Structure formats: structure tokens, C-alpha cells
Design a protein with these regions (language model features):
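Nucleotidyltransferase catalytic core that binds NTPs
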Residues: 2-134
Length: 134
């Protein structure tokens, strides 16, 4: 059996910029929170089909703390980066062992990378309508 191609793993904005600076052809992005399953891999395969052999697929893996409300368990959200990167490489490796796209880039930042000044606080005051709709 042929070996699996390894995606380019980036963890910071400069690393991502460097990876994309030389990335070939058209690009497609698939945004995820990780813990990839077949549905994610199908989206990545479709992205690869659309950009073709000379394009670049970027997969983001970011568990965004802003997506969790107070009382929801951010810490319980699975973190499976190593397995996710392996699954992506497996999914986009052709029968000859070559990557089926020009480049596969994984961007897996930490919250500190995404929010260098700390998490932004957004407050929305919907006014009196909120009391009616609650």
C-alpha cells in the first residue's frame, strides 16, 4: 500500500501566510472544529475535486471558545489534531501515494493566536423585544 501524504500543518498566522504564499492554483477552504468525521472528509474531498490537481485545499481546525455559552463545556469538546491531520492526509492521497491536490494546508491555531488581545466581548441589547420573545 502507498504511503499517505502529510498535509502542511500551520499553527500561526505567519506560518499560514508562508504556506499560502507558494500554494498553487485555485483555493478552497473547509472550516471545522476538528474531531473530523466522514461528513468533514466528504467536504474536503469535494473541495479537492473543485480545485483540482493544481489547487490548494485549506482545512481549518479551531475550537472557538466564543461558540460556547456560559455553562457549556468548552473543555469537553474533543481535541484530536493528530488523528484529524492523519485522516485528511489519508482522504486526499491517491492510489499512487501522491496528494490529489497541489497542496493540503491545515490551519490549527490556538485561541491565543486568534484572539491575541484576549477574547472580544460583544454585548447586544435587543431592547424591549427581548422580553416578549424570551
Amino acid at each position: 500500500m502507498a504511503s499517505t501524504c502529510v498535509p502542511v500543518l500551520t499553527r500561526s498566522r505567519p506560518e499560514l501566510a508562508d504556506a499560502l504564499a507558494t500554494a498553487p492554483g485555485p483555493r478552497a477552504v473547509v472550516m471545522t472544529m476538528g474531531a473530523l468525521h466522514q461528513g468533514h472528509l466528504d467536504l474536503v474531498a469535494e473541495a479537492a475535486r473543485r480545485v483540482g490537481a493544481h489547487g490548494t485545499v485549506v482545512v481549518t481546525i479551531f475550537v472557538n471558545p466564543l461558540q460556547f455559552a456560559a455553562g457549556e463545556d468548552l473543555d469537553a469538546s474533543p481535541r484530536t489534531l493528530r488523528a484529524d491531520v492523519q485522516a485528511l492526509g489519508d482522504a486526499l492521497t491517491g492510489p499512487d501515494g501522491a496528494l490529489v491536490v497541489g497542496r493540503l494546508v491545515v490551519f490549527a491555531p490556538t485561541p491565543e493566536v486568534m484572539y491575541p488581545g484576549g477574547q472580544p466581548a460583544v454585548r447586544i441589547n435587543p431592547g424591549p423585544v427581548a422580553t416578549v420573545l424570551e
